[in-house]
Amino acid sequence: MAAVGVEARPPVTAMEETCNVKGAAAKQGEGLNKYYLQHLDELQRLQREKSYNLNRLEAQRNELNSRVRMLREELQLLQEPGSYVGEVVKVMGKNKVLVKVHPEGKYVVDIDKSIDITKLTPSTRVALRNDSYVLHLVLPSKVDPLVNLMKVEKVPDSTYDMIGGLDQQIKEIKEVIELPIKHPELFESLGIAQPKGVLLYGPPGTGKTLLARAVAHHTDCTFIRVSGSELVQKYIGEGSRMVRELFVMAREHAPSIIFMDEIDSIGSARMESGSGNGDSEVQRTMLELLNQLDGFEASNKIKVLMATNRIDILDQALLRPGRIDRKIEFPNPNEESRFDILKIHSRKMNLMRGIDLKKIAEKMNGASGAELKAVCTEAGMFALRERRVHVTQEDFEMAVAKVMKKDTEKNMSLRKLWK
């Protein structure tokens, strides 16, 4: 039986053994390096989590600290004794002020060292300590939110160039409104008092409101517009309070113009009546308005414009000089004025050549400025209806017929009034 042969391996040399040892060490080093890198990534992730938690806790701590400070201040205010609320009447000296406290009366009080006396103007609301009556705090003005809504934030964009046929009225209103605001030194040099109020009266649609907006634009004043019907309130005393706060806001934003439209709704003549149907509240509102007109000085740069189409029913106490210093009438435009108004309202329209606006003005005898503007609008609507991009003479004639047709018997009584 033959023996199986076994292949003999060559003997391992020292060099080969060294290489094997180095290879095993390299593999072991790569494993350790990978392990340490993974461990390092894990530690970095933990460090980021801890930093995030630390920042979150610091933010919570800051928020809690601010709440604690706020609560401490609130607690301190609650622990302080209450104060009386008063109104400054007059500054008596360097550290004395005459204050009116309701319902107790008027007192001359000391001023705290922390109060700037230059801020203590008449009608300023202040707080007095209940033990020593020392003035220690200046309070903000209390104004009804409804009154704040009456203030027009944006300066009106109406100008004198947009008003036609009212050259004389523009001249008169410039003298009593614009000139005192821009050049008060002229009145001081002459030694005359500045006018306080102006009444604009005339039929509807003759440009009273438009002229008031133009005055506010050219004088760059705060324009406060209020309708007389807004001052007629349901509860007793509410209308009077709104009138007071209206003038307080006007003083704060001086120079300012208060424009009261439809003044006949609160300024009608008083009659003896015990019916209790709400007329007494309207009369209280008018009396407060008269008081405010008498109370503020003309040098405060507060001007009052009033507009109405029923001057015949206004109370004579409202119309007397010193309250209303000038009355400006706004009649319906004549033929030349109607032509000027038509040119103003049609200058941006795409008109065909040969349109005779003077002929249109002749046909609209007795029309107001609002009706003339309506004619231009209706003429454009007739052109739009026929898919044209220009307005013709026929469009204007049709517009005149349509607008003037509305002037029927229901308006005759008003026209007879203004003849």
Swiss-Prot record:
One of its GO terms (molecular function) is ATP binding. It comes from the Eukaryota. Keywords: ATP-binding, Cytoplasm, Isopeptide bond, Nucleotide-binding, Nucleus, Proteasome, Ubl conjugation. Pfam families: AAA (PF00004), AAA_lid_3 (PF17862), Prot_ATP_ID_OB_C (PF16450). ATP binds at G202, P203, P204, G205, T206, G207, K208, T209. It is found in: Cytoplasm; Nucleus. Its main location: cytoplasm. The 26S proteasome is involved in the ATP-dependent degradation of ubiquitinated proteins. The regulatory (or ATPase) complex confers ATP dependency and substrate specificity to the 26S complex. Belongs to the AAA ATPase family. PANTHER family: 26S PROTEASOME REGULATORY SUBUNIT. Component of the 19S regulatory particle (RP/PA700) base subcomplex of the 26S proteasome. The 26S proteasome is composed of a core protease (CP), known as the 20S proteasome, capped at one or both ends by the 19S regulatory particle (RP/PA700). The RP/PA700 complex is composed of at least 17 different subunits in two subcomplexes, the base and the lid, which form the portions proximal and distal to the 20S proteolytic core, respectively. This is 26S proteasome regulatory subunit 8 homolog B. It comes from Arabidopsis thaliana. The lineage of its organism: Eukaryota, Viridiplantae, Streptophyta, Embryophyta, Tracheophyta. The gene is RPT6B.
